[in-house]
Amino acid sequence: MVNKIRANYHTHIFLCKHAIGDVEDYVKKAINLRYHTIAITDHGPLPKFLQKKLNSRRMSIEQYKEIYLDSLARAKEIHKEEILVLSGLEIEYMDELLLQYPIFLSELDFLILGQHYIKVNNEYKSIYSSLNDDEIKLYGDTVVRAMRSGYFKILAHPEIFAWNIKDWNQTCIDVSNQIIDAAILYNVILEINVNGVRNSFYQRKEFYQDDVINFPYPRREFWKLVKTKNAKVMINDDAHAPNRMHDEYTEYIYELATKMQLNVVDRIEGINQ
């Protein structure tokens, strides 16, 4: 159990168009925090037709090639004696990207799976919309298929399907168990996403059950199931600004994970372990 904050693997920079700060800003912040590792994992580019259709705010493939990769390479070299800088992307699992994942992995250290869309009747639907039981099951099937592919080391906000769900029903339980079991089988780390707490407070989506605060994500019911299976867990800020690294919400989630005795890790097997 890691009980001291020493790394962060989920950060976004200005290229995604809904974050601030560049690679150097995050690296310097991590050095000041005395972290051993900082990973830059901005939202991965989509094919132009799909990005336009989804109106998804993220870098273009040209920005990825001309700005992102160069910035990461430069930071790795400049700070190699101070901190380990890892390069990555947070990206969805989509049929349209199947040929792109191996290319990304040839250029980066690792990929995070962040499934913000599911394909319903051949149309992509945002995970932040209200999902019915069948769509929750579809989310579970999609992320399990993604983990089976071997392309991803971390599953970001695995319980994000519950963003608009307060009643944790049997479908939520079944899909959660499906995801957790697959993460164990395919050696994918489950991420407790601190930004879910921030967003819950900002959007007033926190709620109470038996006088205990809960959030759409991180969702207590999900992480209680994770505890029963002892799956590997990583706490990440999902920072969209350098000052969102290691803030009061980060401390809160570390304390909660410690109380729950979750199997928290701060290194990725095969990458920096």
Predicted regions and their residues:
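Conserved radical SAM core fold
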Residues: 47, 117-122, 199, 241
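Short secondary-structure boundary/capping elements
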Residues: 22, 67, 138, 214-218
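Extended, intrinsically disordered, low-complexity segments
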Residues: 263-273
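Active-site-adjacent C-terminal substructures of enzyme catalytic domains
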Residues: 167-247, 255-259, 263
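Short beta-strands and strand-loop turn motifs
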Residues: 8-11, 155-162, 190-195, 234-237
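Extended substrate/RNA-proximal surfaces in nucleic-acid metabolism proteins
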Residues: 52-54, 58-191, 260
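An N-terminally biased module of ancient metal coordination in phosphate/nucleic-acid-related enzymes
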Residues: 1-95, 166-174, 178-179, 194, ...
